[in-house]
């Protein structure tokens, strides 16, 4: 009803195509709102802020400041779609970052290791490093990508008439109480992994990280941002795109190819990351034990 009133007042165009697009938008909005309602009803995490600014200004969370070797600095700025908070009975505070995406999204730690898809993790660590604001002392619970407008799938008519199944991706703190706080009934609908025989799926272990692993990710990203900042100040901006794999060449959708004149296949970098990024290095004894 609200959408119809708004459209009538501000969008007077009345064509068959417009009517179809409007009906599709209403259906999508209704489905998403119902999903968010159901998720909030069972979750211990609740929105603490939406469109939360990181950087400077009123109501903003201070962005992390990175100090370079020559005395210059780099400051993180941005906007968090949604920051959720959970406070335990003992006073322990947890914070998670939620990002709404369209289409598909998969968080790949190998890509994070190389400097891709770092945004939400950098935002999370800025919140947990907040020394005097609303998130002071909060523990990192993770980052979630909510596919708010899933890419269309080929399916039969009966399945197409069912409710949209929203998918989550991301990285969550590897503690059972955090899982329960996000997905009380262990349905797998509200976590980036499912359950198998009553336990988190072993095949989706890369969607979970204990505090030690999160700390390693944080330190690695600190080094990456510092390195990037130094290179920018030094004028090192060669057109050498990082191609993460087949179909992942960033030049395909870049609007500035006519400026850098990059030629596909020339001067491109490939992913160079450990097989298990951010995991502790195995000792010789551990390697021998696995081989035995």
Language-model segments: what does each one mean?
Residues 1-292:
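Structural signature of nuclease core domains in nucleic-acid processing machines
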């Amino acid at each position: 009803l609200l959408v119809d009133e708004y459209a009538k007042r501000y969008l007077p165009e009345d064509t068959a195509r417009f009517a179809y697009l409007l009906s599709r938008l209403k259906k999508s909005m209704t489905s998403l709102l119902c999903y968010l309602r159901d998720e909030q009803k069972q979750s211990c995490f609740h929105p603490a802020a939406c469109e939360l600014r990181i950087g400077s200004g009123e109501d903003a969370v201070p962005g992390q400041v990175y100090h370079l070797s020559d005395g210059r600095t780099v400051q993180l700025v941005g906007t968090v779609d949604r920051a959720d908070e959970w406070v335990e009975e003992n006073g322990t505070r947890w914070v998670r970052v939620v990002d709404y995406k369209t289409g598909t999204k998969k968080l790949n730690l190998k890509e994070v290791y190389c400097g891709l898809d770092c945004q939400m993790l950098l935002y999370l660590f800025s919140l947990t490093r907040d020394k005097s604001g609303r998130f002071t002392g909060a523990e990192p619970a993770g980052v979630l990508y909510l596919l708010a407008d899933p890419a269309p799938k080929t399916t039969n008519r009966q399945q197409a008439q069912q409710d949209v199944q929203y998918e989550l991706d991301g990285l969550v703190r590897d503690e059972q109480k955090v899982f329960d706080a996000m997905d009380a009934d262990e349905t797998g609908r509200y976590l980036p992994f499912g359950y198998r025989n009553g336990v988190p799926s072993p095949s989706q272990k890369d969607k979970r990280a204990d505090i030690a692993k999160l700390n390693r990710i944080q330190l690695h990203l600190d080094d990456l941002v510092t390195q990037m900042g130094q290179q920018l100040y030094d004028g090192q901006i060669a057109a050498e795109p990082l191609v993460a794999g087949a179909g992942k060449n960033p030049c395909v959708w870049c609007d500035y190819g006519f400026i850098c004149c990059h030629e596909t296949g020339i001067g491109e970098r490939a992913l160079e990351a450990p097989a298990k990024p951010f995991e502790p290095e195995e000792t010789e004894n551990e390697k021998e034990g696995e081989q035995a």
